[in-house]
Regions:
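An N-terminally biased module of ancient metal coordination in phosphate/nucleic-acid-related enzymes
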Residues: 1-65, 100
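Active-site gating/metal-coordination segments in enzymes
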Residues: 64-143
Protein backbone atom coordinates (compact mmCIF):
# COMPACT_ATOMS: atom_id res chain seq x y z
CA UNK A 1 0.00 0.00 0.00
CA UNK A 2 1.32 3.45 -0.91
CA UNK A 3 1.81 6.11 1.77
CA UNK A 4 -0.88 8.29 0.21
CA UNK A 5 -3.40 5.46 0.58
CA UNK A 6 -2.88 5.15 4.33
CA UNK A 7 -5.16 7.15 6.65
CA UNK A 8 -3.34 10.10 8.20
CA UNK A 9 -4.00 12.56 11.03
CA UNK A 10 -2.02 15.74 11.66
CA UNK A 11 -1.43 15.78 15.42
CA UNK A 12 -0.38 19.43 15.81
CA UNK A 13 -0.98 22.30 13.41
CA UNK A 14 -1.99 25.95 13.60
CA UNK A 15 -4.49 28.09 11.72
CA UNK A 16 -3.61 31.78 11.52
CA UNK A 17 -5.94 34.13 9.67
CA UNK A 18 -5.13 37.72 10.69
CA UNK A 19 -7.34 39.19 7.96
CA UNK A 20 -10.53 37.62 9.37
CA UNK A 21 -9.28 37.39 12.95
CA UNK A 22 -6.83 40.21 13.73
CA UNK A 23 -4.21 39.50 16.38
CA UNK A 24 -4.85 41.04 19.80
CA UNK A 25 -2.41 43.93 20.33
CA UNK A 26 -1.20 42.60 23.71
CA UNK A 27 0.20 39.37 22.18
CA UNK A 28 4.00 39.80 21.93
CA UNK A 29 4.51 38.16 18.51
CA UNK A 30 2.35 38.45 15.40
CA UNK A 31 3.09 35.79 12.74
CA UNK A 32 3.20 37.11 9.17
CA UNK A 33 4.08 36.08 5.63
CA UNK A 34 4.80 32.37 5.26
CA UNK A 35 3.86 31.78 8.91
CA UNK A 36 0.19 32.55 8.18
CA UNK A 37 -2.11 29.75 7.06
CA UNK A 38 -5.89 29.92 6.88
CA UNK A 39 -8.28 27.01 7.45
CA UNK A 40 -8.96 26.93 3.69
CA UNK A 41 -5.25 26.64 2.96
CA UNK A 42 -4.87 23.87 5.56
CA UNK A 43 -7.77 21.97 3.95
CA UNK A 44 -6.01 22.16 0.56
CA UNK A 45 -2.74 20.85 2.00
CA UNK A 46 -4.57 18.07 3.83
CA UNK A 47 -6.37 17.06 0.63
CA UNK A 48 -3.09 17.00 -1.29
CA UNK A 49 -1.54 14.58 1.21
CA UNK A 50 -4.64 12.54 2.02
CA UNK A 51 -4.82 13.73 5.62
CA UNK A 52 -8.28 13.04 7.02
CA UNK A 53 -8.23 14.80 10.40
CA UNK A 54 -6.18 17.32 12.37
CA UNK A 55 -5.65 18.52 15.91
CA UNK A 56 -5.54 22.31 15.67
CA UNK A 57 -3.54 24.07 18.37
CA UNK A 58 -4.42 27.66 19.13
CA UNK A 59 -1.09 29.49 18.81
CA UNK A 60 0.08 31.52 21.80
CA UNK A 61 2.04 33.63 19.35
CA UNK A 62 -0.53 35.56 17.41
CA UNK A 63 -3.71 34.84 19.33
CA UNK A 64 -2.85 34.16 22.97
CA UNK A 65 -6.16 33.26 24.65
CA UNK A 66 -8.29 34.56 21.75
CA UNK A 67 -9.72 31.32 20.34
CA UNK A 68 -12.05 32.78 17.68
CA UNK A 69 -9.91 31.72 14.70
CA UNK A 70 -9.47 28.21 16.10
CA UNK A 71 -13.19 27.79 16.83
CA UNK A 72 -14.19 29.10 13.39
CA UNK A 73 -11.88 26.57 11.70
CA UNK A 74 -13.36 23.71 13.74
CA UNK A 75 -16.93 24.87 13.02
CA UNK A 76 -16.24 25.09 9.28
CA UNK A 77 -15.12 21.45 9.14
CA UNK A 78 -17.50 19.44 11.34
CA UNK A 79 -15.87 16.26 12.58
CA UNK A 80 -12.60 16.86 10.76
CA UNK A 81 -10.83 19.07 13.31
CA UNK A 82 -10.49 19.01 17.09
CA UNK A 83 -8.71 21.75 18.99
CA UNK A 84 -6.35 22.72 21.79
CA UNK A 85 -7.25 26.18 23.14
CA UNK A 86 -5.34 28.83 25.01
CA UNK A 87 -7.01 29.93 28.25
CA UNK A 88 -6.16 31.88 31.39
CA UNK A 89 -5.59 30.12 34.71
CA UNK A 90 -8.83 31.56 36.12
CA UNK A 91 -11.01 30.32 33.26
CA UNK A 92 -14.38 29.21 34.67
CA UNK A 93 -15.77 25.72 34.12
CA UNK A 94 -18.69 27.17 32.15
CA UNK A 95 -16.34 28.57 29.48
CA UNK A 96 -14.38 25.31 29.35
CA UNK A 97 -17.70 23.48 28.80
CA UNK A 98 -18.52 25.88 25.94
CA UNK A 99 -15.13 25.21 24.38
CA UNK A 100 -15.59 21.44 24.72
CA UNK A 101 -19.02 21.66 23.05
CA UNK A 102 -17.34 23.41 20.11
CA UNK A 103 -14.69 20.72 19.56
CA UNK A 104 -11.95 21.70 22.00
CA UNK A 105 -10.44 18.62 23.67
CA UNK A 106 -7.71 20.25 25.76
CA UNK A 107 -5.74 23.37 26.53
CA UNK A 108 -2.12 24.39 26.03
CA UNK A 109 0.47 25.32 28.64
CA UNK A 110 3.33 27.04 26.81
CA UNK A 111 6.17 27.19 29.32
CA UNK A 112 8.61 28.03 26.52
CA UNK A 113 6.83 31.34 25.88
CA UNK A 114 5.39 32.25 29.28
CA UNK A 115 7.79 30.63 31.75
CA UNK A 116 7.03 28.54 34.82
CA UNK A 117 5.62 31.38 36.92
CA UNK A 118 2.78 32.03 34.49
CA UNK A 119 1.24 28.65 35.32
CA UNK A 120 2.10 28.53 39.04
CA UNK A 121 -1.52 29.05 40.15
CA UNK A 122 -3.30 26.51 37.96
CA UNK A 123 -4.45 23.77 40.38
CA UNK A 124 -8.10 24.84 40.15
CA UNK A 125 -7.92 24.97 36.34
CA UNK A 126 -6.38 21.48 36.24
CA UNK A 127 -9.22 20.19 38.44
CA UNK A 128 -11.86 21.76 36.15
CA UNK A 129 -10.20 20.19 33.10
CA UNK A 130 -10.10 16.77 34.76
CA UNK A 131 -13.80 17.00 35.63
CA UNK A 132 -14.56 17.67 31.96
CA UNK A 133 -12.30 14.91 30.63
CA UNK A 134 -10.04 17.43 28.91
CA UNK A 135 -6.24 17.32 28.81
CA UNK A 136 -3.28 19.69 28.91
CA UNK A 137 -0.71 19.89 26.14
CA UNK A 138 2.62 21.10 27.53
CA UNK A 139 5.25 22.91 25.47
CA UNK A 140 8.64 23.61 27.01
CA UNK A 141 12.29 24.16 26.14
CA UNK A 142 15.12 22.03 27.43
CA UNK A 143 17.79 24.28 28.86
CA UNK A 144 21.16 22.99 29.98
Amino acid sequence: MHLFDLPKIDGHCHVLDPVRFPYPPEVPYHPAGQEVGTAAYLAQVMAAYGTKHALLVGPNSGYGTDNRCLLAAIAASPGRFKGIAGVANDTPASYLQELKAQGIVGIAFNYALHGLGHYADNAALMARLAELGMFVQVQFELRS
